[in-house]
């Protein structure tokens, strides 16, 4: 039988390191609650970033996934994770920096690791809104479910990267800084609404699940955390269109209090005509436009 999460970490002398952005969770009931929020189905293929001392890892494995692949950069955690693997052979451990992982390649590795043979579906019609601008005329039959307590310093970057590969993802249930979760879920004309809100909501259905107090971690961070769930929409946007939305929102929200016709004039000289054609009030500010408004601007450019 495995020791408790805290005792297991102590036995391996694994203490949280600031350089890795580590704040460990030793409360198994909280880990179970996170997994419940994901609605993880049996026989899913799961990805976890930064398992650390393996608390969330254990809770995921107890749900009988087909496989769980964990990405860990801290060598000190590997012996501990390998001990968990002795009880759960469907655990795959990869020592790597999460920012260097390509989800497309990783998904193929996950499939191969469980001997999963997939069939190619009949290709669907390609549109500029579907993620087919990189030659993806063949639909992908395998997807991963991502469940992770993400390091704060790379969390937002990972979310954006994964959203660009949404066709490979069933859902993402993530622990992030509470402020970041509020930005992901924010509605127009609110203080938290911004670029992250627009991009996330154009690609996925987003839902804040619950807050997590600093006292749930060791050591306690200075801020609250929260759990957010993102479920990619059925027809993901193309990479080209996402990049265009990123470009537009970067300009728009750089001058948050400027009118949109002023913020975007360097990108689109005839911005007044474009906004008029789309029936968007050109006196609106960046925070007043809904995600779909930004998408319509991107599509017409």
Swiss-Prot record:
Name where it's found.
Answer: Cytoplasm
For the keyword RNA-binding, the answer is yes
| The organism's place on the tree of life at top rank | Bacteria
Q: What is this protein called?
A: Ribosomal RNA small subunit methyltransferase A
Function per UniProt: Specifically dimethylates two adjacent adenosines (A1518 and A1519) in the loop of a conserved hairpin near the 3'-end of 16S rRNA in the 30S particle. May play a critical role in biogenesis of 30S subunits.
Q: Identify the keywords attached in UniProt to this record, alphabetized.
A: Cytoplasm, Methyltransferase, RNA-binding, rRNA processing, S-adenosyl-L-methionine, Transferase
What InterPro entries does its record include?
KsgA/Erm, RPE2, rRNA_Ade_diMease-like_C, rRNA_Ade_Mease_Trfase_CS, rRNA_Ade_methylase_Trfase_N, rRNA_adenine_dimethylase, SAM-dependent_MTases_sf
Instruction: Return the SUPFAM superfamilies for the record.
Output: S-adenosyl-L-methionine-dependent methyltransferases
Which family does the record assign? Belongs to the class I-like SAM-binding methyltransferase superfamily. rRNA adenine N(6)-methyltransferase family. RsmA subfamily.
* HAMAP family given in the database record: 16SrRNA_methyltr_A
What gene is behind this protein?
rsmA
CDD domains for the chain: AdoMet_MTases
Q: What is its EC number?
A: 2.1.1.182
- Which Gene3D superfamilies has this protein been placed in? Ribosomal RNA adenine dimethylase-like, domain 2 (1.10.8.100), Vaccinia Virus protein VP39 (3.40.50.150)
Q: What class of enzyme is it?
A: transferase
Gene Ontology cellular component list: cytoplasm
Q: Give the binding site residues for S-adenosyl-L-methionine.
A: 23, 25, 50, 72, 97, 149
Q: PANTHER family in the record, alphabetically? A: DIMETHYLADENOSINE TRANSFERASE, DIMETHYLADENOSINE TRANSFERASE-RELATED
Name any one GO molecular function: 16S rRNA (adenine(1518)-N(6)/adenine(1519)-N(6))-dimethyltransferase activity
- Which catalysed reactions does the entry list for this protein? adenosine(1518)/adenosine(1519) in 16S rRNA + 4 S-adenosyl-L-methionine = N(6)-dimethyladenosine(1518)/N(6)-dimethyladenosine(1519) in 16S rRNA + 4 S-adenosyl-L-homocysteine + 4 H(+)
